Amino acid sequence: MHGLLLAAGLLSLPLHVLAHPQPSTSTSLAGRAGAVDLNEFRIAHRSSYTSHDEMKKLPSIASFRQGTYLEVATELVKQTIPNMEFRLVDDHYVGDSGIGHVRFRQTMHGIDIDNSDFNVNVGKDGKVLSHGNSFYTGPAPSSNPMVKRDFIDPMQALHGVRKALNLPIKADGAHVEDMSEHKVMFKGTSGALSDPTAKLCYMAKEDGSLALTWRVETDIGDNWLLSYMDAKESSKVHNVVDYVAHATFQVYKWGLADPTEGKREILTNPWNLKTSPLTWLSDGQNNFTATRGNNAIAQYNPDGGNDYENNYRPSPKNLKFEYPYSPDMNPPKTYIDASVTELFYTSNVCHDLYYMLGFNEKAGNFQVNNRGQGGKGNDFVILNAQDGSGTNNANFATPPDGQPGRMRAYIWTRANPPRDASFEAGTIIHEYTHGLSNRLCGGPANSRCLNAIESGGMGEGWGDFYATAVRLKPNDTRKTNYVKGGWVNNSPKGVRMYPYSTDMNVNPLVYTSNNKLNEVHAIGTVWCTMLYEVLWNLIDKHGKNDGPVPIFENGVPNDGKYLAMKIVMDGMAIQPCNPNFVQARDAILDADMNLTKGANKCEIWKGFAKRGLGVGAKFDPKNRTGSTQVPNECK
């Protein structure tokens, strides 16, 4: 099933289409009258994380070594939680940092417990580096539900979800087709972009009990939902996950955040053949003359629909994607060729840079043709420019590996003339990073691991962090402040509570600020603020590479900027499903331990501690404890 994660946009958008508007206090179904607040259905935080330092205190386990990394990981699960029923998730891989990432799903009577996962990270030495665990340990159901089948049928579940969430789906006359023992597809519905499905699974509830549910998947465009309907009571929805978080090329060159930072240039063959060996205009089987290739397909989508294959996209003679554009041009459709080209360019550069940093085929990146390098193909990113389904936002939908991602870039009406999100690179990088974080956290096959309020906030924070790191200029120092979304929003304050700054007087956010925040974009601002501190600590130590790509020495970026981007990315793959800030911090420390043998431990600790996530910081969803302490060796 989809592990889609709705990548939130720059701001808080309705529901989970992640986008950029003004911060709001709730997340509701996009565009729905009387919309349901999805925050009420978020999955509760249940994960634990055993860091590398904690593993060293458990020599009998940490030193366990036998066979392949899969065998080591499997044995660890058996030793840690004996007599549990589980299965290996088929998305394990060894990342480019040498860490073997293995994930397991708990089962009961052969039925998945959909939010019970165990991830094991095996180091290059064959020993367990760290692990995360959210396995259910409460009482097991006394009987197999498949024997008596005393649960509602899937059609009742679909109707229940439709009614409970006010979804625009009609199912009168629809019928069910079996896909597997526990999964069905609904044929004959209308109102969804693809046929809805339902899968029978358990959900571990916040009160420690287990609920049998139908996981109903519905893609209605702005929201791509996994709704967990109680299998005994068709009016009770336990949880909801939203997957949407929302030649020559004349473009604003990579590194320019928006049109205020520079002029457009004509670039020849801007792809990197090490990361896009088929170029951006081929999938290995077909060569294209339009904005389509192995990594992405970009088009004009004025009606906001899903028929992207037949939508207009520029297809110039001689592959010269050179079109006029000025922010003063109006209406926006007069420069649609330039808009689609810019969106295609920025997204492809994201693909290439993230590939260099470790987001490759095995890790679940977005490509049609994986060229035998692992992972699942047929999943480029669908890029919709000037998407007509909304305004003042952008969003990204991240299904599991093997299914295309989808980005929608909207027109912003806060200025006159309106502004096109395709031309604010920070917006597009933020959205693309939702695809990165949702595929890495939980593994390529599970896009449901950034759904708790704090992990969802980190999803927003990572988007801002990568967009900000990319836009750093040669003369920037730790005193440089950056706002998010200032150009599209026509506001010097941007779309966040505070600028990103290392000055506590400019940005006072600390870990305990989260105690008063209940919206993912606001929480994400706290997380990115911490990462910005770590970024500058590493730059001050290692310098800053102002080029468009990292330079590696023995697999390690030789500057602070790209090193920060690398270990933050590695941390995403190491951390448990639905992590909290403390666990994600520890995963970054473990990523540095693996990559550099902990050479940057103190710089990382000091960055987090300055913002209250030091030694002694504790997570509690209602009463977080802050700490400015660092380990003794860092004082």
UniProtKB/Swiss-Prot annotation:
- Report keywords, A-Z: Glycoprotein, Hydrolase, Metal-binding, Metalloprotease, Protease, Secreted, Signal, Virulence, Zinc, Zymogen
Question: Where would one find the signal peptide in this protein?
Answer: 1-19
Q: Which residues form the propeptide?
A: 20-246
Quote the EC number: 3.4.24.-
Q: Which residues bind Zn(2+)?
A: 430, 434
Residues in the active site?
A: 431
**Known role:** Secreted metalloproteinase probably acting as a virulence factor.
UniProt name for this protein: Probable extracellular metalloproteinase 1
